[in-house]
Amino acid sequence: MKKLKKWSLGFLSFILLFLGATFIFHRISLEKEKASLTPMGQHVLVNGHQINVYVEGDGLETIVVLSGAGIASPILDFKEVSESLSKQYKVVIVERAGYGYSDDSNYSRDVMEVLSETRQALSQANITGPFIILSHSMASLESLAWQEKYPDEVKVLIGLDWALPSSYENLKQNQALLTLAYWSS
C-alpha cells in the first residue's frame, strides 16, 4: 500500500511539474510571438481600448466589412475579398474588440454597443459614409440596426450567410453555454 501511495504521489508530482512547465513555455512563446507580429491597419481609441481599422483601396465608395462571431482575424479572413474589391472601392475592415489586433473589452457585447464602437472607430479613423455595409453571419444584426437607426449612413446592405434577428434571442438564452465555450477555448 505504501508503495502505491508513493508511486501515486510521484506520478501526481510529475503531472503537476509537466503542466507547470508547459504553462510557462506557452506564456514565453506567446510573448515571443507578440513581439514578432506586425499589426495590419491602424489603432483608434474607443471606450478606452484599441480598435484596429484596416483600409485598402481608394475608390469613391466605401465598403465596411463586418465579420461574424468567431472570426479570429477579420482582416486575414476577408483578405482576398478586400483585395478584389479594393480595385474599385475603399474597403474598410473594423476588427471589433476581442478580434484580430484589437484589444479585449469588458463592455457589453450587445448589438447597439458593438454598433456604437464600430461607428466611433470609423469616425476616429476619419472614414465617412454613406457606407456599403458587407456583413457576415451575426454581424447582420449590427448592420440591420445600423440601417434602422442611422439610415443616412447606410447606402447598401450586403449579406454573407446572414443570421436572422431571432438568432440573437437564442444567444441571450444560451449565455451560460457561450461563456463556457469561450473559457474552454
What do the PLM-derived regions correspond to, one by one?
Residues 111, 150-185:
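Flexible "cap/lid" subdomain of the alpha/beta-hydrolase fold that forms the substrate-access gate
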Residues 85, 146-147:
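Aromatic pocket-lining residues of Rossmann-like dinucleotide-binding sites
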